[in-house]
Amino acid sequence: HFCGFETLSAPVRAQLARVADIWQTRLAGDLLGVYLHGSLALGRFAEPVSDLDLLIVTGRRMPRRERLSVAAAVFEADRKPCPLEMSALYIGDLRPWRHPAVCQFHYSGMWSDTYRRLLDGRLKDCFLLDTDFPDDDIACHVRLTRERGVCVFGCPPAKLLPAVPETDFWQSICGGVGTFDLYAYAPRCLPGNLLALVRGLSYKVEKTILSKYDAGL
């Protein structure tokens, strides 16, 4: 059973509200937008298996302590009930558009153990907190959010986010195919990773951004 934003269950809506509050509490007036993309924006969200994919845009850079504070709160909200995946971008890194875009915060299931060790002190340093880092995936996230995204907080995504050139988008969804390691992720991620590769091929043919499910049909 799939759903979109309008048909989300109360627990998932509460989780989304909690995530938005995490960012609003810490960024206040410097939070420009919180947007949903991914399967939810494409109407193929399956509770509680699908990730809640979010893109956050800030009006200033985030210092390390703020990133760690956000990470602690997001870690507690993760999988209650849905897995969370999000990237936070500084608006100054989006305008003018450059590829790969620079990311200043990222959280996903792949990095949850790293954050656990950062939060309990076993790990002292990590690029996720210590640097702004280039991320090839951002081009795909920005374009999907701009075209199909759901606004949770802020202005409509098409007013805030830049247009992503076709060449950058294509490189974003297919650039790592040759070196992609399906088994570098948790076993639960394997079907989704396979379908992500199929989605890239489907875009080449259809020139339309499809969900992983629809691309696999």
Can you say where each PLM-predicted feature lies in the sequence?
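Helical scaffold of the NTase/Pol beta-like nucleotidyltransferase catalytic core
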Residues: H1-Y35, R65-E66, A71
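Conserved NTP/Mg2+-binding pocket subregion across the NTase superfamily
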Residues: F2-L8, A72-P187, L194, G200
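Catalytic metal-binding acidic patch
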Residues: L36-A73, P83-Y90
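CN hydrolase (nitrilase-like) catalytic-core segments centered on the catalytic cysteine
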Residues: V198-I209
